[in-house]
């Protein structure tokens, strides 16, 4: 169970953000769970409210400033509950690629995109990241293992980073693979909450 506001160490209560001073992000690949579940225009799929994206910027910029690279993961909507007539996922409607241009604009730099969130191809993309680069992976809810809290799916996600940061406070109460379960793959010195 995560505690968002405070953490205790050696009998002292610290503000959660203090953990940032204990983690060295330099030349590290950081897996960050963000909450980019934002509203989109029903016709153009453009972001109509970027509040949640803006809320993640302090954490993202902190890691980049400290010399890290990062893989961002999020869900968008409920794709497995709103399947197409043929039973397939409506990728066009629920892809996180819709977030890419707005995120790049707000961050002031190019953000790369991976067409999946697990698998050899995305692992290779993550490994090739240089300091200061950002990779956004595809919607975690395209996989059943996400909402089921599947440990095997979480282990696949964990391959994308050396450090795990949960910056998705709005979803932290759910025992999903990309929030609670994936954190179990990282020791205490390699995981923390973001500024949210």
Which residues fall in each region the model found?
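Active-site loop-to-helix "anion-binding N-cap" substructures in soluble metabolic enzymes
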Residues: 2-196
